[in-house]
């Protein structure tokens, strides 16, 4: 974009609880916010927040790379001329900041009924904790109106996790609450099928990434023999949807793809994956990847334009104790955009790391 000036902000987001995954505990997550300003006073925001241990751009050099990119943009270099092939979160942030500016800079990136009050169907996420705590959290979410609940599993003894799901099913049958599982690649290939057969007893909709990615033959066998539908998540990271998706979908036979724009290179890249799911008769849903409310806002507004009836994985600002206030509101299994609520955005005196020159 011509005559646009860019600034870079950083906020260390602090989890409001002990966030655990099968890859370990997370206490903070760095959010990098790009602010674009035009001579007419239009301001847009985008977010680049790669996930450590997962995103291909979550490296020690990332902040310096991002500073250099902002410097290049302020020197008049077009974003399309920059090599961002290994920086998917930056592609997402620049795509969304430019969408924001192009649409008037009101944090309204797409024109949809979502912005006019039509809510989006979403799943409730149960973070990894002790099995008892997870059970209690799932019950609370079901009582709060969520009829699709996703459990992160794989960190505890298999029998313990089965008993947790059994206890949940005693209170909420499959007609009342759909269960999704996410193993984050925690199962070993030779143990995955027996575990999936055990988990099938609890009427499971799907399980994300039962084994670690890049094990094509093992994943192919699991997809073919599993009694539970398989969803691919981490498997997509670093792949090109236009050249790699056909081989992935045809070989594995996976039923669902999980699309995370921060990890895949933005909304346009996610739409390329959607085209592949249509070609191979698969389904998908989108999931946020621990972004702040700025990144979540962009993803939620985009998913609202896709007319996907499946529950989306749109985690909300309640994850963090120092997130940005937002018009987004999660209630009774739906995500709402409350147009009368205002944003709070980064403060220059505290969080600005690249100034206008």
Locate each region found by the language model.
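N-terminal capping/lid subdomain adjacent to the active-site entrance of alpha/beta enzymes
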Residues: 1-179, 184-186, 200, 325-357
